[in-house]
Every structure is written in structure tokens, then in C-alpha cells.
Regions:
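Glycine-rich phosphate-binding loops at beta-strand->alpha-helix junctions
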Residues: 16-17, 181-189, 209, 234-235
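Active-site core segments that coordinate phosphate-bearing ligands/cofactors
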Residues: 2-3, 8-10, 111-140, 150-170, ...
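A short alpha-helix-loop-beta-strand transition element characteristic
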Residues: 73-75, 82, 118-125, 173
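N-terminal glycine/serine-rich phosphate-binding loop of ATP-dependent small-molecule kinases
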Residues: 1-98, 178, 194-195, 199-204
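Short beta-strand-loop/turn "lid" adjacent to the catalytic site in phosphate-handling enzymes
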Residues: 68-105, 132-155, 177-182, 186
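Gly-rich Lys/Arg/Thr-decorated short loops/hinges at beta-loop-alpha junctions or inter-strand turns
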Residues: 38-47, 141-148, 169-176
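Short beta-alpha connecting loops at secondary-structure transitions
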Residues: 42-47, 100-103, 256-266
Length: 309
């Protein structure tokens, strides 16, 4: 029987939670699932690690919630897009599993090249590189998620061919994943990943970009006199650009969701909207349970109270 309607999956792996959303081909949300990440391991200033295999575990939980709410034939899902948080570091063993906890973008160790002090480490990559492997078994990643201490050439969107650059960043080419541009197929969902997540095996996993670039595209940040203020865990502003500006003083150049296009991004506020979550949690689980039982949320209650301030 021919499948009439077709659907896509969007995966958004953030700093605080993971969301998996199923859309129809016109962009309407059909259903979704969300899973909170565990509190980060932050034993001292400058250290911020995602505990255990939390990024993947949250994807499994969010995916199962979304697919559990999907009432159509799973065979009607024809592909998925993968987007994760940027500026993180994942160190993988030869089999693609984590050699150590993922360093979150708030970890100050990311300001320095990877020291290669763990003999288990075979690949050094981003969160999207790691999650791509978990879904597809491939050692590939989107070029547009390599912001920070990486030997990437932002003009070509490939690894630098300059040996001195590779030495500066202390990552030999053999320890880096192969890069593809946003919109390219990274691989296909394996039977193992399908069994864990409920996402149909064999559908293509498509590269997107870093989370801020995906947000910019989704918000309609296109050429013209338009700016975007991104209200995430990290708060920042950005505008569209068409060339890699290397000597900017008051912003940095981030790779966009469109190949060979850029975003000029301001400095920002670290732990910006995370502070909202922190403030909410000060009121305790009892409040959250009580308001959720009434069909609302702690955030909505706080919004209502804020009107009286």
C-alpha cells in the first residue's frame, strides 16, 4: 500500500534538554517528545561535563516519547535532521563510544587544544559527530558545527591542509572525522539505533549546522537589515553574512546553515536562559508537580506573578 502522507524528524540536542519533533512536509508539528538532561558535573570553576552517556540517553528518551505519540505509519517517516549544541568536545574510542564524558561549551578546557593524554581516544569530535555515529555508524560530521579550537578552514569548510595549523591545534587528521556540508546525508539509521530510539531503520540522517545557525535559519534570518537575538542557555545576537571575516574586533564569524554563508555573532551572556531554569528550580519539585497537575507549568506561574512586580 502506498504511503499517502510523509513526515520528517527534527532532533534538537540542547544544553538542558533534548527535543525530537515530527513534522509534515509543510512544516506543521505533528507530535514531539522532550527529555531533560541530567545536571552537569561542575565540581569546580571551569569544569562542565555531561555525565555518563547523557546526550545519547536523552535522545533515546525523547525519541521514544515522540514516536509513542505518532499515530501514522512509521514507514511514512522519510528522513531526519540532526542538530546538537556547539562548542563541545567528544572524545571517542575506536568503536565510536565515549572515552570520557563530553565537555560542555562552558568548560574552560575547550579554550586549549586537546592534550591527547588518554590512550583510549581515537577520534576527537563535536557532539554532532558523536551522535551521528550513534545513529549511523559513520565517522562523519557537519562542517558547520566546528566553532572554537578546531583546525578548520572557514573559507573551504574543510580541515586545514596546513600541517602547521594541525600541529597548533594538536589534532592529527587521522583523529578527525570526515566533514560534509549542511544538507548532505551523513548516513542512515542503523538497526541498533532504531531499536533503541524507535526511529525507523534505514532513513537518511541529514547534516544541519550548529544550534545557533539552525535557530537563525528557522527564524528567517536572511540577507537584509534583520538581526536575531537568540534566547538560549547562551544569549547572543547575530546577523547574516556572505564572507568569512577573520579580523573582526566586536563579533566573531560563525558558519551558517547554508554552505559558504556565515553569521556575524556578538558576544553574549553565558548561562543566560539557564538562569531562568535555576530560578524555577529554587521553588522545588513540589511546586512543579502541583502546577503540572493543574495543567500549567512553573514558568507560566512565574510569568503570572511577574505581572505584579
Amino acid at each position: 500500500m502506498k504511503v499517502k502522507n510523509k513526515y520528517l524528524i527534527g532532533l534538537d540536542g540542547g544544553t538542558q534538554s533534548t527535543k525530537v519533533i515530527i513534522f509534515d512536509l509543510e512544516g506543521h508539528v505533528v507530535c514531539q517528545g522532550k527529555a531533560q538532561l541530567k545536571p552537569m558535573y561542575m565540581p569546580r570553576p571551569g569544569v562542565a561535563e555531561h555525565p555518563d552517556d547523557d546526550l545519547w540517553d536523552s535522545i533515546v528518551a525523547a525519541s521514544r516519547k515522540a514516536l509513542g505519540r505518532f499515530t501514522e505509519d512509521p514507514a511514512s517517516i522519510i528522513g531526519m535532521g540532526l542538530c546538537t549544541i556547539r562548542c563541545c568536545r567528544a572524545c571517542l574510542k575506536a568503536d565510536g563510544h565515549l572515552a570520557s564524558p563530553v565537555l560542555n561549551w562552558m568548560d574552560l578546557r575547550l579554550a586549549s587544544p586537546y592534550p591527547f593524554d588518554d590512550p583510549q581516544v581515537r577520534y576527537v569530535t563535536t557532539t554532532s559527530g558523536y551522535i551521528t555515529h550513534r545513529f549511523t555508524g559513520e565517522f562523519r560530521d557537519t562542517a558547520a558545527n566546528y566553532e572554537g579550537m578546531w583546525p578548520i578552514d572557514k573559507d573551504t569548510w574543510q580541515w586545514s591542509g596546513d600541517q602547521k595549523v594541525l600541529e597548533t591545534f594538536n589534532v592529527p587528521r587521522k583523529n578527525l572525522l570526515d566533514l560534509v556540508n549542511p544538507g548532505s546525508i551523513l548516513g542512515y539509521v542503523t538497526d541498533d539505533a532504531s531499536e533503541q530510539t524507535g526511529i525507523p531503520a534505514g532513513i537518511p540522517v541529514v547534516a544541519t549546522a550548529n544550534d545557533k545557525a539552525v535557530e537563525a535559519l528557522g527564524a528567517g534570518l536572511l540577507p537584509g537589515s534583520i538581526g536575531l537575538v537568540s534566547l538560549g542557555t547562551y544569549i547572543g545576537g547575530m546577523v547574516y553574512g556572505e564572507r568569512n571575516i577573520k579580523d573582526a574586533q566586536f563579533f566573531f564569524t560563525n558558519m551558517a546553515s547554508i554552505p559558504n554563508r556565515y553569521l556575524y555573532e556578538s558576544g553574549g551572556i553565558r548561562q543566560g536562559m539557564w538562569t531562568v531554569s535555576w530560578f524555577r528550580d529554587l521553588f522545588g519539585k513540589e511546586l512543579a508537580d502541583a502546577v503540572c497537575a493543574e495543567g500549567t507549568s512553573p514558568e507560566e506561574v512565574l510569568n503570572q506573578e511577574a505581572w505584579h512586580v
